[in-house]
Amino acid sequence: MNSRGARPLFAAFLLSAACLLPSCAGKPPEILRVLWQVTLVDDRERDVRYTSVSLFVKPSDPDGFEDLAELYLIHDGEELFWKLGADSWQKSAAADPWIGSNGIGLPDGSPLPAGEYRVLLRDVGGDSTEQTVRLPAVGLADLERLVPRVEVRGREIRVSGRGVSHQLWLYDANGAYLTVRPMPGNRQSVDELLAAYPQLAGGLRFRVYAASGQERLGAVSGPYFWEP
């Protein structure tokens, strides 16, 4: 769940965080790694475009994964924060899971302000740890030029545009996420996809991600459909 803090709310949040930090004698969590990415989303179902930040951390907690409670992205200068709880963050299926979200953004869909952000992880006892990330200044027009053009012709997917490379984000006919598959060129045979993923024989949905060539910036368009 995304939050935008007005000044009184932001001040109250900082006060509560300060009160909680020393309150517990348990072992604090750790952030082992942080991954982030800024993406322009071309949502064809809703006919809207907006920017979104993906933020994921690889956590460690001596008291167990279940001890983790909240993950925050905080911009102190702009008095903005986003809060993810254990009931709202996305979690990978790995033995050592990542937690985070692909949907961090502003209500109007504009890019997040550039600058330094704190990534704060808190456990149920109030102990916390944090790292910082720096988001670049992102021009919306530059990202919009990256949106790929996609065409499904028969049993072939064709992609064109300004992206330096492309990926297929694959889902089954019911919309369940399957995998990410790099595109070696600008065409992808559906038969190759069906051979690799037989569960898609009844149909598939997909999105196409275009990388900008700049680290952690890109655009994604979809969903698109193929049916036998």
What are these regions (language model features)?
Residues 62-71, 160-174:
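Solvent-exposed loop/turn segments flanking beta-strands in beta-repeat/beta-sandwich domains
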Residues 89-106, 184-195:
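Aromatic sugar-binding surface patches on proteins
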Residues 1-24:
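Sec-dependent bacterial lipoprotein signal peptides
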Residues 24-36, 129-139:
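Proline/serine/threonine-rich low-complexity linkers at boundaries of modular beta-sandwich domains
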Residues 135-156, 225-228:
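Low-complexity, Pro/Ser/Thr- and charge-rich linker/hinge segments at domain boundaries
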Residues 111-125, 199-215:
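Short, aromatic- and glycine-rich surface loops/edge beta-strands on solvent-exposed regions
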Residues 128-136, 214-228:
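Edge beta-strands of extracellular beta-sandwich domains
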Residues 41-59, 149-163:
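Contiguous beta-strand segments within globular domains
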